């Protein structure tokens, strides 16, 4: 399924192409050859469209690269404790149970540490304190 960013990029490139064609049409005598200029503009705009639009947002290669980057950054680092999705869900539910049973509510259960990381692969890592 096409995303909004891609459609917006296609629309903008199309509008630029239409405006350039109108410029060539009304000032055609000043240009060399209309067909040559139009084909050149089409090639340039197609190239810019391919470079400017992110066509591979959710492809498998990006997911693999993201997972390998994730492993390099967090899994081998001893300062981080990494859990799978099931482990983190179990730990989070245990934290909620502990909070409900604890009468002292002086702290918030929300962790706002910038160095915490949650990847699309459903593995969460938290920096050890």
Swiss-Prot record:
Transmembrane feature ranges: 4-24, 37-57
One GO CC annotation: plasma membrane
Protein topology in the membrane: Multi-pass membrane protein
Superkingdom in the source lineage: Bacteria
Primary residence: membrane
UniProt keyword Membrane present: yes
Alphabetized InterPro entries for the sequence: DUF5425
Pfam families with a match to the protein in the record: DUF5425
Alphabetically ordered keywords of this record: Cell membrane, Membrane, Plasmid, Transmembrane, Transmembrane helix
Annotated disulfide bonds: none
Cellular compartments annotated: Cell membrane
Family: To B.burgdorferi BBF20.
Annotated protein name in UniProt: Uncharacterized membrane protein BB_D15
Source species of the chain: Borreliella burgdorferi (strain ATCC 35210 / DSM 4680 / CIP 102532 / B31)
């Amino acid at each position: 399924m096409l995303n909004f960013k891609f459609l917006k990029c296609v629309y903008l490139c199309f509008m630029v192409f239409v405006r350039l064609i109108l410029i060539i049409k009304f000032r055609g005598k000043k240009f060399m050859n209309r067909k040559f200029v139009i084909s050149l503009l089409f090639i340039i705009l197609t190239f810019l469209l391919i470079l400017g639009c992110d066509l591979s947002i959710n492809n498998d290669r990006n997911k693999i690269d993201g997972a390998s980057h994730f492993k390099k950054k967090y899994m081998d680092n001893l300062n981080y404790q990494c859990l799978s999705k099931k482990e983190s869900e179990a730990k989070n539910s245990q934290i909620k149970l502990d909070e409900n049973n604890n009468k002292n509510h002086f702290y918030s259960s929300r962790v706002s540490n910038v160095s915490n990381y949650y990847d699309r692969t459903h593995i969460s890592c938290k920096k050890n304190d």
